[in-house]
């Protein structure tokens, strides 16, 4: 899940938005002007729930992406995106997968991030060719 969230963060940065992931070496302080995006299929994973609680205590908004809409993480969220696929809880309302564990959730999260980036680019009328200015150039 972390890799998918890091990829979403990268997509948002490529749109010229200030985006950081929790734990990166240059992570700034979160403020009431910020949005924390957490992902957890079950919504009960300790780290996402703990950082969501901390972000709320510091006045930030929280968006949660996951499967279990009755979870602790969902209860903390200002915004919810439900991806109703297999989680560690194995709830009957989750789409089952032949893939192990939460692979389908991680893949769906990555695709959701790509779609979100495209929607933001369209709504901001961004010139997609102009976005290369934000792409890494030490490659």
Where are the regions a protein language model picked out?
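Glycine-rich phosphate-binding loops that contact phosphosugars or nucleotide phosphates
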Residues: 2-111, 117-118
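A short, charged, Gly/Pro-tolerant segment at domain boundaries
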Residues: 115, 121-139
